[in-house]
Design a protein with these regions (language model features):
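Ribonuclease/tRNase effector modules and their secretory precursors
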Residues: 1-88
């Protein structure tokens, strides 16, 4: 996990590539917007980021805070990246 914003390391699941949005675009949005706390459909607390990427596309990003069992540094795991224009 080499990506980071501020104090957080960032990891990405494979499913974040579903809409063919690159990690750099997701990192840009995460670094330039304030997250909103949300609860996922699985009832897990998460952060929602919505904002324009470096190309002007508005993206929505959902990230979970992960606390490893071995007391390693917590990190954000991005589980969803999608252009908001695809939202019905």
């Amino acid at each position: 996990m080499s990506d980071d914003i501020g104090r957080w390391e960032i990891g990405f699941t494979q499913s974040t590539r579903r809409h063919r949005i690159g990690r750099a675009s997701a990192r840009h949005v995460m670094a330039s917007t304030e997250p909103t706390p949300v609860t996922t459909s699985s009832l897990v607390d998460a952060w929602l980021y919505v904002g324009p990427d470096e190309r002007g596309r508005e993206l929505e990003i959902i990230a979970l805070e992960v606390q490893p069992a071995d007391a390693a540094q917590p990190y954000l795991l991005v589980i969803h990246v999608m252009p908001t224009q695809l939202r019905g």
